[in-house]
Amino acid sequence: MANKSTTRDLILDKIREVELPRAEHPLVDGLLAGAIEYADTVGTFVDSAESVGARVHFCNTDNVVDIWRDVCNEFGTGKTANVAIRGLDDDDLTDESPHSASELVVYGTSGMLGVAENAAIWVSDRAIKHRVSLCLTQHLVLQIDAKAIVNNMHEAYAKLQDIRDDYGVFISGPSKTADIEQSLVIGAHGARTLDIIVVEG
């Protein structure tokens, strides 16, 4: 009688011998043609963000650092980390263990693109050192360029098609969950608040 490891190997070998016909990706031209578009993508993004509990702040390249300071100062003197704007004298987690993220009060970084229809912001590992920081911080601050806001998820995925990041996630609003009684709880599984800084010009 064959032992378990031998039986396992035999099964895997048999599976590898099977040649399945290659399936082509389904065409999604029809979906793209019917995808929603907005006359004002930035305005729609703001409405979507506020509807899911986020706050939106506008600034230009001249006062972006001041806006970051104002937003972070609202949450007191807690530890802020990995703020992707030069000129802020905050602590940085870049050389620390991911476990240190449990101490975060405010965590700020930049998003690559935003989506108007659902206020989702794409954050990749290019902008963060420890991905767990996005979930463990009490308050999350994300910066997005107004020109990087697209209409819908179809356009967002098209822009991400050729990007090869090891990790990335769409974030929309603060953490939210609801039980069977439909009691909404904010911040149970992630950040309690989300502030979005939209840079224009």
Give names to the regions the model predicted.
Residues 1-201:
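The feature marks the mature, well-folded catalytic cores of soluble enzymes
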